[in-house]
């Protein structure tokens, strides 16, 4: 049973949001899944939904590979809802039963096609290691454009974000057709997390003349808000229409949500830590201090330190981020404290913020975008070795 009321009927939202409800319901015939949670924050619901609509309607990633990536992400994030919803779509797109079983059971990919192996390995490495090795990245890029691989990466990041919502709020399928069993990962030695490579794996888009005329308004919007196009946007601009939708979500979460500045920045740096993303850390650790977070809090996040000595508000936000990343679940006591302290819309926005910056980290980590050499460093430790 879900931890909060699911918004499934028009009367579940305020009168002023009825039109929004009907607009979103018309897209799929009903409100279901993550939307039943995200609609607790109506201002976020439309931009949040538009990323999924773009991916499903306009992405150049072939359905076979998109759905395989989604199923592999559901497996890595232990999300039964996404698995149940997307296994039938994967079969319809041409993914074989043997391939789906390999993903479900966490088996080695021996015997699968080279393309299937590359997609599954890409998902596993990106989620388990927060890095993708060069041979896997290169094999996927061969025969495809940077736009294709950017969009595949966002498919993975997006469904990690959706899994975070569904797992945290304990949303389960109404009708279970495809069960996702608990399957432990094979025991492997912890592997060191390497620093980003010296240069991005594709040429970032940082100049207006790199963009087709019809998409230059999107480039201009990014540049006006940040002074230049850099970091994740230099990669996302390989898919300009997707970049615009990503920008809209980030703008709401950073400037229009109910999250306080210190809570928002704390969740962002905690996500950067869990994702081993030096770029996000360098960009937001100074902002976190400016928002009022103490040096002790920032250090505890950076060093994966004990949270016992932190104030309860900050401790719970960091713990929530850690549990989602490490356990694919959130303990009931922690969830109840956050909901009781802040309310459901706030908690929805926090969860979406963590997911949004998870997408950013996926793009930065996969495409090897490093911060400036003199930026504040993020020490890197060890992680599982995804294969």
Sequence positions of predicted segments:
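Hydrophobic alpha-helical segments
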Residues: 1-387
